Regions:
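N-terminal organellar transit peptides
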Residues: 1-97, 103-177
């Protein structure tokens, strides 16, 4: 039976000179298992409480989840002008990498952490026309993802597409390169 209650795992800690946000777990509106998750609504609520003149440290350990939610979180966080440092503490995979690839942020990946990018996925059903529409949506999602990765990494579209097509895993050291 699906878990229809979102169980928040996003935490805020206000320090004198910095705000700390923890994003731990899958990114989803709801989760089908008994696992905690976070989404863009929670991030927007937390972000509204953040002092806009104070830098933010974000700690993330996430296997990914909803691309739409991760894109929204990227957009929400990109509005902060006082500086953001994102710390990958364990895993940033799939959609979570869209949060770690925030253009205006410094990204730090802890030794031993992993980073993984791949093409977006979907579970779809319907007739041929509906499935063709879903393919178009997936291609547009992949295009948006590539754009974010290119902006953050400086790699060109062909290189990013190749890495996504291969479902590429990086060590902390490889991801920084």
């Amino acid at each position: 039976m699906p878990n229809t209650e979102l169980r928040p795992i996003l935490a805020i800690q206000e320090k004198e000179e910095i705000t700390i946000l923890n994003f731990f777990g899958p990114i989803a509106e709801k989760w089908w298992e008994d696992e905690k998750c976070f989404n863009e609504a929670e991030v927007a609520k937390a972000f509204a409480a953040v002092n806009p003149n104070k830098p933010i440290d974000i700690y993330i350990n996430s296997p990914g989840g909803s691309v739409a939610s991760a894109l929204a979180i990227n957009g929400i966080l990109s509005r902060h002008k006082a500086g953001i440092t994102i710390h990958v503490t364990g895993l940033a995979a799939s959609a979570a990498t869209l949060i770690t690839s925030l253009k205006n942020a410094k990204t730090v990946i802890s030794k031993g952490s992993l980073f993984m990018i791949h093409n977006p996925m979907s579970s779809a059903y319907g007739n041929a026309e509906e499935l063709e529409k879903q393919i178009d949506v997936l291609n547009k999602c992949a295009e948006s993802m590539r754009s974010i990765y290119m902006e953050k990494s400086g790699l060109d579209e062909k290189e990013i597409k190749s890495l996504m097509d291969a479902e590429t895993w990086f060590t902390a050291e490889e991801a920084v390169e």
